[in-house]
């Protein structure tokens, strides 16, 4: 019975963290909408993780540092709240491996017809991943995953969870290239994959255009850089 109690406890903690983040978004809303608070929080988290993990292109480092400072000036006195929210996100991902940001986005009512952005319920992503991920994956023959419309990274997280549930170390058995036209989806994917230790290249752009990708449109997770956070 002990494993059942432990699993239940973890789900409760993960859910609690999600509820706390949604509450924090509502508290910070006022001058800016909840949608804008969410978007700026995720962007700030992505910029911070990327630069702290070591951005070896100094021009890109400076540009992302400037973007982060713009957010800090816009939300003066709130960056500590953003950091707390990132901490709660980390706890939720550790306790209940799923598309936490997609769930927050939908439960907070940020997805609507105006924005045109919705996120697939994670249980559906997981069922799809169970079919899609090959049975012969291992550290010597990792699963190479290309996600041309990543959203918040839900399908990638689902694939990682399938590997974990098979008793494999997904941090060594999964390599990802994820892309999305929407910057928010890029930031959401990058933050969650970084916190989960997934090796990934996350790109902003149209996967069907065939155009070259500029350096500032590419994010490498810490794991891709050889680090674990």
Task: Locate the predicted segments by residue.
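Conserved SAM-binding motif I beta-strand of class I
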Residues: 176-180
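Peripheral peptide segments
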Residues: 2, 227-228
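Class I S-adenosyl-L-methionine
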Residues: 10-167
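A generic, residue-level signal for flexible/boundary positions that often mark functional hotspots
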Residues: 112-113, 175, 189
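N-terminal amphipathic/basic-hydrophobic helices that include classical n-h-c signal peptides
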Residues: 1-13
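Residues at the starts of beta-strands that form the adenosine-phosphate
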Residues: 144, 173-175
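S-adenosyl-L-methionine
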Residues: 168-169, 182, 187-227
């Amino acid at each position: 019975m002990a494993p059942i109690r432990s699993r239940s406890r973890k789900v409760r903690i993960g859910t609690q963290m999600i509820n706390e983040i949604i509450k924090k978004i509502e508290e910070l809303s006022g001058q800016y909408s909840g949608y804008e608070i969410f978007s700026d929080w995720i962007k700030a988290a992505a910029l911070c993780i990327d630069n702290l993990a070591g951005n070896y292109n100094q021009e890109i480092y400076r540009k992302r540092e400037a973007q982060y400072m713009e957010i800090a000036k816009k939300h003066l006195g709130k960056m500590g709240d953003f950091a707390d929210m990132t901490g709660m996100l980390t706890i939720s991902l550790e306790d209940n491996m799923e598309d936490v940001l997609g769930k927050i986005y939908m439960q907070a009512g940020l997805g609507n017809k105006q924005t045109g952005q919705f996120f697939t319920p994670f249980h559906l992503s997981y069922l799809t991943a169970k079919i899609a991920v090959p049975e012969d994956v291992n550290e010597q023959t990792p699963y190479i995953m290309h996600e041309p419309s990543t959203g918040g990274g839900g399908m990638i997280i689902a694939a990682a969870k399938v590997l974990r549930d098979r008793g494999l170390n997904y941090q060594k058995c999964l390599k990802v290239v994820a892309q999305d036209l929407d910057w928010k989806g890029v930031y959401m994917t990058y933050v969650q994959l970084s916190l989960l230790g997934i090796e990934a290249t996350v790109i902003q752009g149209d996967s069907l255009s065939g155009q070259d990708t500029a350096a500032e449109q590419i994010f490498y997770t810490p794991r891709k850089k050889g680090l674990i956070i």
